[in-house]
């Protein structure tokens, strides 16, 4: 395995796609894999985790920092930029074992050849640090001009987000620092040590500051001029290049926000200076060492299938890039740190699709993700109250403080160009159960019950109260129902008794009962605290009653099929191809009140199948199989979340040959850059961390058959026919275990740390 992804395409679509595919990041920030000379029309972005802004009536979205990677060149008064001037050769190369992006471009001029090389990484050791090494070589004598500095004209979807931009320049000479207040021209004879550039960009909404500092070290003296406008501050470096002489410089960049610390300016400069003293090679070595530590536990080896092996580990690379290791309470957005799609909001994706990877390899990160939900409980309670419910109704698109960024109008009609009313925010009530499922999974795997006293217990109980307040009972009926919801499918809105939603509500009731019982027996002091906060006896009686009487759709008479929601089987039963043929526009939204799928049995993504994966022990094998056979041909898989659930259920039915294509669809979601990029006229492109997490779940839990049974690791592999071996490690309750599975045998061994 060479751990390298390469690409040479330069068409507009490839440039956008490569921004996602060649992303580097360290959890604090993500840097799209665009070239140094690209301006905002090519979607460059240094996307920041957990900080947002709203401009006017536009959608609230995460911030992209001013671009301090910006660099362009002129050779003998000719600008050499991609894609403006076609190169003789060009390649992007991502070392996804170590998060290093390399670029090589070769141009032919009328005098000879010009070669540009660059290498960048977002330091995994120092979260605020980004390093770029850049070189230019011509095979003839020429004048080379490099423009490099900070581009403050940032790509935004609903921006611009900075209402005030202030540049600061410092001239460094013989350990002296002089603040420059105007454009400055220096000759190389002035014994120049460099200019350090900074930008302070202030947001509209909260007046937060994003502070970016950069400095360079160059291997050759130059004539230097500072060029400043409202949106950029650049050095103009003029070199007298000799034939085959490499001009090389390293940029040391720091990114801070005013949310990080009070003295962000001082810290920014301090880290840049330390980085310069440390040097490029040493910084890269330290960065690579952190990556090696991560891969020591998380690498998965698939023998007999190089494509699957590469794609899966590349998927895990993307999860590592966006893991908030720097925080005690932060989650992961649906598109990671690849941009502002979906408003940089946190969805159910994190708990249901990504959590297992972190739980099995970095439990402390899993706890960080869950703490985010605990810390946004008040926002969930406010939302529930707003809609007239009790307890905690979590945000469908969660931002700071649990604020729900989801709009009432998420889709634009392609024909009228008018916004369409959608009900994701109002009716996808299954979101709260995802948080409970995540906490329950964490408790079961880690046996770390401290999270309950840190707010986890209250979170579970408030979610249980929320679902109890949703229950309805028809006159003359003994069971409860849940009406007017949207299940995972999403194309069918405002339905009654969605099977997944109802079963997850029951899981929430069960979990609340379980944790109250646990705390009563294990932590009397904390239980007494809960007694003071809640009417525990009354609450327990209600939850037990709800558990016993909540209607969960069961297989129909004379059939093993479970109806997705009331009346689903009465909808038009038509093929996926027929529904697709009814589209009048390629970007037309399939769901909602008038979508082509809305009145048919065609669904967007796994719904009943997701329920069966989570609660497989409650159903006979034939029920699992028949529902797979029925729902899969009717599923569009319009979401990257869908394929892994079908893959998992096929594995549970001992059909790895059918699971494999769905596994590969998840694993290749970002590798090949062919993910869905539009919902109506709304751009939804970016990386797909839920698909990455889904690929991991399928490999480990599906093909690998990994599970914890009574505190003991078990593995019952169901490998695809062409797989020779599946090997992986997990961190379980403080110890590393290696599971090595072939078709003949399985070994589980404890690894000394």
From Swiss-Prot:
Activity regulation as described: Does not require divalent metal ions.
GO biological process, any: carbohydrate metabolic process
Protein name per Swiss-Prot or TrEMBL: Nigerose phosphorylase
Coiled coil segments of this chain: none
Enzyme Commission number(s) from the entry: 2.4.1.279
Catalytic activity, reaction form: nigerose + phosphate = beta-D-glucose 1-phosphate + D-glucose
Gene3D superfamilies found in the cross-reference section: 1.50.10.10, Glycoside hydrolase, family 65, N-terminal domain (2.70.98.40), Maltose phosphorylase, domain 3 (2.60.420.10)
GO CC list: cytoplasm
């Amino acid at each position: 395995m060479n751990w390298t992804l390469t690409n040479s395409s330069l068409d507009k679509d490839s440039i956008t796609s490569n921004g996602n595919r060649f992303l580097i990041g360290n959890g604090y920030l993500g840097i799209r894999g665009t070239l140094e000379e690209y301006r905002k029309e090519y979607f460059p972005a240094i996307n920041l985790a957990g900080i947002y802004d709203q401009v006017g009536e536009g959608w609230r979205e995460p911030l992209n920092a001013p671009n301090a990677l910006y660099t362009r060149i002129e050779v003998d008064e000719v600008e050499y930029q991609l894609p403006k001037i076609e190169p003789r050769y060009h390649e992007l190369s991502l070392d996804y074992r170590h998060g290093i992006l390399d670029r090589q471009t070769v141009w032919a001029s009328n005098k000879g050849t010009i070669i540009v090389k660059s290498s960048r990484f977002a330091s995994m050791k120092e979260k605020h640090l980004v390093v770029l090494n850049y070189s230019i070589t011509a095979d003839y004598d020429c004048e080379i001009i490099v423009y490099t500095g900070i581009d403050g004209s940032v790509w935004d979807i609903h921006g611009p987000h900075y209402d005030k931009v202030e540049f600061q320049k410092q001239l460094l000479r013989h350990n002296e620092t002089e603040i420059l207040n105007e454009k400055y021209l220096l000759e190389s004879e002035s014994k120049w040590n460099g200019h350090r550039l900074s930008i302070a960009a202030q947001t509209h909404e909260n007046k937060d500051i994003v502070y970016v500092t950069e400095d360079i070290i160059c291997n050759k003296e130059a004539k230097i001029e500072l060029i400043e406008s409202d949106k950029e501050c650049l050095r103009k470096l003029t070199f007298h290049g000799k034939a085959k002489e490499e001009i090389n410089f390293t940029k040391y960049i720091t990114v801070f926000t005013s949310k990080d610390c009070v003295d962000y300016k001082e810290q920014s400069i301090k880290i840049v200076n330390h980085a310069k003293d440390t040097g490029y090679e040493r910084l890269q070595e330290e960065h690579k060492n952190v990556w090696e530590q991560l891969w020591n536990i998380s690498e998965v080896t698939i023998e007999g299938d190089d494509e699957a092996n590469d794609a899966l580990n590349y998927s895990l690379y993307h999860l590592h890039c966006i893991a908030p290791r720097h925080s005690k309470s932060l989650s992961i957005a649906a598109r990671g740190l690849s941009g502002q799609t979906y408003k940089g909001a946190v969805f159910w994706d994190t708990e249901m699709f990504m959590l297992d990877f972190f739980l099995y390899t970095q439990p402390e990160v899993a706890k960080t993700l869950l703490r985010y939900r605990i810390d946004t409980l008040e926002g969930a309670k406010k939302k529930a109250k707003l809609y007239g419910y009790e307890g905690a109704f979590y945000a469908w698109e969660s931002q700071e403080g649990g604020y729900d960024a989801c709009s009432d109008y998420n889709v634009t009609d392609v024909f009228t160009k008018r916004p369409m009313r959608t009900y994701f925010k109002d009716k996808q009530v299954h979101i709260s159960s995802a948080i409970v499922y995540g906490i329950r999974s964490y408790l079961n795997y880690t046996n770390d019950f401290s999270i309950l006293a840190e707010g986890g217990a209250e979170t579970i109980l408030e979610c249980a109260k929320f679902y109890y307040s949703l229950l309805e009972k028809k006159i003359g009926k003994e069971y409860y129902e849940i009406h007017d919801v949207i299940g995972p499918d999403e194309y069918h809105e405002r339905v009654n008794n969605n099977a997944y939603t109802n079963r997850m509500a029951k899981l929430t009731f069960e979990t609340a009962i379980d944790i109250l019982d646990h705390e009563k027996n294990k932590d009397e002091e904390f239980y007494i605290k809960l007694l003071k906060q809640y009417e525990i006896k009354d609450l327990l009686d209600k939850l037990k009653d709800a558990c016993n009487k909540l209607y969960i759709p069961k297989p129909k008479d004379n059939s093993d099929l479970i109806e997705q929601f009331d009346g689903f089987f009465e909808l038009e039963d038509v093929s996926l191809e027929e529904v697709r043929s009814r589209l009048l526009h390629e970007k037309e939204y399939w769901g909602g009140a008038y979508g082509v799928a809305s009145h048919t049995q065609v669904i967007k993504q796994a719904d009943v199948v997701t329920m069966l994966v989570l609660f497989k022990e409650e159903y006979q094998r034939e029920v699992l199989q028949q529902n797979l056979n029925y729902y899969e041909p009717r599923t569009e898989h319009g979401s990257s979340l869908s394929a892994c659930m079908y893959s998992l259920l096929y594995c549970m039915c001992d059909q790895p040959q059918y699971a494999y294509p769905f596994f590969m669809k998840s694993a290749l979601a970002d590798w090949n850059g062919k993910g869905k990029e539009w919902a109506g006229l709304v751009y939804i492109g970016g990386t797909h961390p839920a698909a990455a997490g889904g690929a991991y779940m399928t490999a480990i839990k599906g093909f690998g058959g990994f599970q914890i049974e009574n505190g003991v690791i078990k593995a019952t592999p169901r490998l695809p026919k062409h797989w020779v071996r599946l090997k992986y490690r997990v961190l379980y309750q403080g110890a590393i275990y290696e599971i090595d599975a072939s078709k003949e045998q399985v070994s589980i061994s404890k690894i000394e740390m």
